[in-house]
Structure formats: C-alpha cells, structure tokens
Amino acid sequence: MATISDIDHPDDLSSLPAGPVEPLEPAGFRLTTPSRHLALQDPAGRLIARCSLWRARDARGAPTTAGLIGHYAALDADAGGELLAHALDRHRADGCERAIGPMDGSTWHRYRLLTERGTEPTFFLEPDNPDDWPRHFTDAGFAPLATYFSALNADLSRCDPRSDTRRVELERDGITLRTIDVGRFDAELAAIHEMSLAAFADNLLYSPIGLDAFLASYTPIRPHLVPELVLLAERGGRLLGFIFGIPDLMEPGRGEPLRTMIVKSMAVHPTCGGKGLGGLLMDDCQRAARKLGFERTIHALMHETNRSRSISARYGTTIRRYTLYERALP
C-alpha cells in the first residue's frame, strides 16, 4: 500500500529515495515556496508521485479561496489519482473552494500541461509532460480552465507593412526602440519586472512576484542571451514595452542547425495600448532574427483569446496546445 508524506522544508527532500519519479529539486522548492510538498511512495519506499500545494494569490498578493497544485509528476494514472486525492483533501481541509493545476505557485513559474503535441519537437524552455498526465487530472474531476498555444512562423521574410508608419508615429510621441544592454542586465531586468507587474495585472490568475524571484527565473536564460533579440521601447528613459527572444537551444542539442528563435515574452504598458507598439516590437524582433540567420520563429505559450488567435493567424500556424485545469471542492 502506498504511503503519503508531507514535506514542509526543502532540506527534507533529500531523504526521499530514488524511484520511478525524480524527487523535486530543493532549488525548485525554494524558488516557488509551496506551503507543503506531498510525496507518494510505494511499499518499497520508492517515489511514485509528487506535487506541491499553494494558496492562490490575487492581483494584490492577498490569498484567495483557490488552492494550487504544482510540481506534479506521477508514474501512472493510479499513482496520480491517489496523489491528487490527497492534494484535494489537503486543500479542502484548508478551506479552499476550488483547486487549480498544474501550476507551480503562480503564472510566473511553470504551469499547464501539454495536451496537443503535434509534430514539432520540443523547443527550449517549453514545458513537457507524458501524454497521459492530462487524463490524471480529468479522471480526478478536473475540467479545462484555460487553453494556450504556441505558433510557428516559418517565413521570416514576411513583414508587417504597417511597421514603418507606426515607427514614425511612435517616435513622434517620443517612443523609441533599442536592444537590451547586457552590461546592465540586472538593471534592465528590474525595469522589465516593474513594467510587467502593470502589463500583466489583468491576466488570468495574475499575482505579483518579487524582484529577487523574477531575477532568479531568468537565470537559465542569461548565458544564452542574444542582445539583438531583446528589444525595449522607452520614452524619456521609462520602459513602455519589451519583447524577449531567445534561440531554440534544443536544435543544436539534437545535432541540428540553430534556425529557430523563440519569443519568450512580450508586453506593452497599459498606457500605450492601441498604439501598435506590440506589433512593431514583434516585427522588429523577427527582422533582427532573420538578419542573424534565423529562419523560423515560435511564438510560445500564448493564452488562447481572440487577440492571440489574430496574432497567430498573422505570424504563423499553431503547433502545440496546452491546458490548465480546475475543479470545485464541495
């Protein structure tokens, strides 16, 4: 019979023996600070499923009535179902009215499951999971809360004909674009962090993130930064928009030529909405990628809304879909 353990401190993760499921790294616990971590072990003591729990936060950082389930991994449907039952019991006992997952504490960290794989191989920093994991959640009574997609533009010669006009209009308004200054990387990220808090405030399940945690989330990217692919839009030294492109390092890892850029994130300050700044950032980033020899762009992990679908239609075709789940806790 499987046994469940509650772990409240990252140092205790080292006590979990090796098994079919890899234990959570202590660094992941420290970065996302869950309220508890659940480990399911078989009769031989091997880890067969794990997850972490949080109370969701609102846009002001205050706790809500939703509980989050993240850091999810399970050997099979039986182990996953048993683990999720324990997780739901914990959230129910804590007074949560619904559960959402998978989400590693907030939308600033890993969340959602890959649910439509397509034929394109996994790209750099893309969340991946076994194809049966979505069924673990639906079998436990979860239903889709939101869907997301990644789109591929395989023709970087296509440019937005409105860009030149928009550039003139924005420059007339005092807004100019430049590449990131790698010599001031932390200071540049601090400005991106501050602007992101405003730009993403209306996003689904948004909650604020501290600067230190934000900087830490960019640690995997820093060694691979290509300054020409990170564009900042400013007026009078104030950041009003950005786009963050990175090379798809999975391609050389597979022995293939590096030919794809990934648009990791893009945002425009709410005061600049409707000016065409987002479109100009996107177009200039793709032009820069083509100039550097890239042949394709992946627009990664966009929330499936009418606006994002129009962006996909203009710049490429959908190659992957992802789902975030929820269920009520009666």
Segments the model singles out, each with a brief description of its role:
Residues A2, D8-H9:
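Extended alpha-solenoid helical-repeat scaffolds
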Residues I4, P127-N203:
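Acyltransferase donor/substrate-recognition loop-hinge adjacent to the catalytic core
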Residues P10-P43, A49-G61, T179, R184-V268:
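A conserved beta-strand-loop-helix scaffold within acyl/acetyltransferase catalytic domains
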Residues T33-P34, I48, A59-T64, L84-A85, ...:
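Hydrophobic/basic alpha-helical segments enriched in Actinobacteria
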Residues S35, A146-S150, I319-Y325:
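Short hydrophobic/aromatic beta-strand or adjacent loop that forms the aromatic wall/cage
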Residues T64-A140, E256-Y315:
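Acyl-donor binding region in acyl/amide transferases
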Residues L329:
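Active-site-proximal cofactor/substrate-binding loop regions of enzyme domains
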